[in-house]
Amino acid sequence: MGQPSLTWMLMVVVASWFITTAATDTSEARWCSECHSNATCTEDEAVTTCTCQEGFTGDGLTCVDLDECAIPGAHNCSANSSCVNTPGSFSCVCPEGFRLSPGLGCTDVDECAEPGLSHCHALATCVNVVGSYLCVCPAGYRGDGWHCECSPGSCGPGLDCVPEGDALVCADPCQAHRTLDEYWRSTEYGEGYACDTDLRGWYRFVGQGGARMAETCVPVLRCNTAAPMWLNGTHPSSDEGIVSRKACAHWSGHCCLWDASVQVKACAGGYYVYNLTAPPECHLAYCTDPSSVEGTCEECSIDEDCKSNNGRWHCQCKQDFNITDISLLEHRLECGANDMKVSLGKCQLKSLGFDKVFMYLSDSRCSGFNDRDNRDWVSVVTPARDGPCGTVLTRNETHATYSNTLYLADEIIIRDLNIKINFACSYPLDMKVSLKTALQPMVSALNIRVGGTGMFTVRMALFQTPSYTQPYQGSSVTLSTEAFLYVGTMLDGGDLSRFALLMTNCYATPSSNATDPLKYFIIQDRCPHTRDSTIQVVENGESSQGRFSVQMFRFAGNYDLVYLHCEVYLCDTMNEKCKPTCSGTRFRSGSVIDQSRVLNLGPITRKGVQATVSRAFSSLGLLKVWLPLLLSATLTLTFQ
């Protein structure tokens, strides 16, 4: 036998190579182009290797997708999710009503809390359940929650179930009604053939025919109809709500030959609305009293009824407000944030014989006026401050009380009875109230203008106790290093519900220069200095005020004064995360401080040292942690 040829030997080697590598994920190749599209080619010197990519299996020359979902332990989908195989990988899919959360698997989606996910009716309440949600119609309404409407008799006092679009809703018929303005409904109009077969629902009569139904039997062949319909009963007063009456039709000598049930309500504007139904026969139509055309009592207040006198309608005080004893005169007191308002009811004053009302406070320059917001009252207003209008301030440890006296007369001169009404408003002491009632608090203030939301004022003050209700007063404070400083910042004006006051950097310097390179940070980058155990941040970025405390200290070296500075920021709670997240022992370098947003307070002098306030130079040296003295400061910021 001769020697095997080189070609035959090469074929054997190649075949052996394929057999050896077929069972592995890696194969040697001559060129990278021989590798499968889902393989990675590696060239190492003279060897070219094909390796299947992650998620695929094969020898590199041929790679097929690995189904991780079918192999135990090959995927990390949670038990409540489904594994879906994808080319080279897999994905975990949650069932409807759930969302994939890292580390938690599939968690329930609260469709009620996220806009656009629930499709409940506007009146319905969304109730979240695991994997879905429910829609519940309110009490008195019927429906499946995706559609809700009221049912007759289910609405509250003074309300009725009325059409609104394609649904029925509970509403006040004084606002939800249609109008009838036909002049021929007047009882003075002659015969005709009108028939109210199409009337159903709440209506108000307006126009030249009259504003209310006739209350007496109407002669036949009037109101442009054959058998006129009139209201068999009196109209209700506004405090009676919705009442039921009978409308009678006059024909053939009978004032009530036919009848229909109607409902009537007296409205605050001095008019009436009627829930009418189609009459039982034709030709029948509802008639109006022509005397109600003029003087329709549109100006009647809620304390008055619309009454007819000699064919003319006018406003008349309700019987409930008639009093004969001055001691029964009621007054309404409103204690506002900045002023106090005391009011007396006009109807009660009229019943006591006050045709004219002269009312004033201890300072007679503060006199009464007709309340524009409520025609039933005459009012007088005084600022909630000590002094204006004769207002007197008294305070204790918990409250500040402003008091004054209201004087009442029916003439500009008084000979006999001098009527006095003492009134007072008490306000719980907080940072704002305590500063307002202090004679000369140490305060720093800053004005801030935020585009579209108005002007804000930020104040900073130093308080004596952890209640933050006793501010230090005067231009400077002297304290020992054993004392604690209680520092409060507060925001006034503008939309306080939207913005939170955030103290970004609060620090002390030995001089009045806020840019002094020697700084001791109490709050830095929104977080307290954790190396000082005496620092306590009570509130920051949570509301319209901020509070922190620290033990008094002094700077090492020849420094006896401490000045406090706070950089503040108005945080938009609708678009920003305002409350700082602070944890661990960190003390960062911080960002550049915006001096236009810095409140400055001081000096605070170490007890036993005579203060020299005129020093304003920058100071270099070491800080010895004793603890800082603080005064109140006020700052004004402008944001464009």
Swiss-Prot record:
Main subcellular location: membrane
Region described as Internal hydrophobic patch (IHP): 454-465
Effect of residue 59 to A: In ADTKD1; results in defective trafficking of mutant protein to the plasma membrane; the mutant is retained in the ER
One Gene Ontology term, aspect cellular component: basolateral plasma membrane
SUPFAM superfamilies: Growth factor receptor domain (SSF57184)
Post-translational modification as stated in the protein's UniProt record: N-glycosylated. N-glycan heterogeneity at Asn-232: Hex7HexNAc6 (major) and dHex1Hex7HexNAc6 (minor); at Asn-322: dHex1Hex6HexNAc5 (minor), dHex1Hex7HexNAc6 (major) and dHex1Hex8HexNAc7 (minor); at Asn-396: Hex6HexNAc5 (major), dHex1Hex6HexNAc5 (minor) and Hex7HexNAc6 (minor). Glycosylated Asn-232 interacts with E.coli adhesin fimH. Other complex glycosylation sites may serve as binding sites for proteins from other bacteria inclduding K.pneumoniae, P.aeruginosa and S.mitis.
GO molecular function: calcium ion binding; IgG binding
Region (ZP-C): 454-589
Annotated segments matching region D10C: 172-291
Result of changing residue 148 to W: In ADTKD1; phenotype overlapping with medullary cystic kidney disease; causes a delay in protein export to the plasma membrane due to a longer retention time in the ER
Residue ranges annotated as propeptide in the record: 615-640
UniProt-annotated stretches for the region Essential for cleavage by HPN: 586-589
UniProt record, GO biological process: antibacterial innate immune response; apoptotic signaling pathway; autophagy; cellular defense response; cellular response to unfolded protein; chaperone-mediated protein folding; citric acid secretion; collecting duct development
Residues annotated as transmembrane: none
Effect of residue 217 to R: In ADTKD1; results in defective trafficking of mutant protein to the plasma membrane; the mutant is retained in the ER
Lipid-linked residues (GPI-anchor amidated serine): 614
Xref: PROSITE patterns: ASX_HYDROXYL, EGF_2, EGF_3, EGF_CA, ZP_1, ZP_2
Domain of life per record: Eukaryota
Entry-listed glycosylation sites: 38, 76, 80, 232, 275, 322, 396, 513
SMART domains the UniProt entry points to: EGF (SM00181), EGF_CA (SM00179), ZP (SM00241)
Disease tied to this protein: Tubulointerstitial kidney disease, autosomal dominant 1: A form of autosomal dominant tubulointerstitial kidney disease, a genetically heterogeneous disorder characterized by slowly progressive loss of kidney function, bland urinary sediment, hyperuricemia, absent or mildly increased albuminuria, lack of severe hypertension during the early stages, and normal or small kidneys on ultrasound.
Protein name as it appears in the record: Uromodulin
Organism: Homo sapiens (Human)
